[in-house]
Amino acid sequence: MSEKIRTMQGRVISDKMDKSIVVAIERMVKHPIYGKYIKRTTKLHAHDENNECGQGDLVVIRECRPLSKTKSWTLVNIVEKAKA
């Protein structure tokens, strides 16, 4: 029985740490009463081994074993570099 590896796509909002990035994942949630769809954001800390990401990059991350107190995701690839 194999587990499915969780992957997420999001935008880098911080790259100030060494070998770490903060990725914002946006999702649409329906309001329980009014029925309107609302954007909700989740911030995840991810491991960036080569410090190749910059702020604003669109990236794919995957879940891994805990690397620190808050970091349990790692960078898979950069989908789109931010325009400088």
UniProtKB/Swiss-Prot annotation:
Q: Which GO terms describe its molecular function?
A: rRNA binding; structural constituent of ribosome
Per the record, the GO terms for biological process are: translation
- Identify the InterPro entries for this entry: NA-bd_OB-fold (IPR012340), Ribosomal_uS17 (IPR000266), Ribosomal_uS17_bact/chlr (IPR019984), Ribosomal_uS17_CS (IPR019979)
Naming one, the record's GO cellular component terms include:
cytosolic small ribosomal subunit
* Gene3D superfamilies, per the entry: Nucleic acid-binding proteins
Q: Which PROSITE patterns match?
A: RIBOSOMAL_S17 (PS00056)
Lineage top rank: taxon: Bacteria
- Which keywords are on file for this protein? Ribonucleoprotein, Ribosomal protein, RNA-binding, rRNA-binding
Cross-referenced HAMAP family: Ribosomal_uS17_B
Please state which protein family the record places this protein in.
Belongs to the universal ribosomal protein uS17 family.
Job description of the protein: One of the primary rRNA binding proteins, it binds specifically to the 5'-end of 16S ribosomal RNA.
* PANTHER family from the UniProt entry: 40S RIBOSOMAL PROTEIN S11 FAMILY MEMBER, SMALL RIBOSOMAL SUBUNIT PROTEIN US17M
Per UniProt, subunit arrangement is: Part of the 30S ribosomal subunit.
**Official protein name in the record:** Small ribosomal subunit protein uS17
Q: Which organism is it from?
A: Aliivibrio salmonicida (strain LFI1238)
Lineage, uppermost ranks: Bacteria, Pseudomonadati, Pseudomonadota, Gammaproteobacteria, Vibrionales
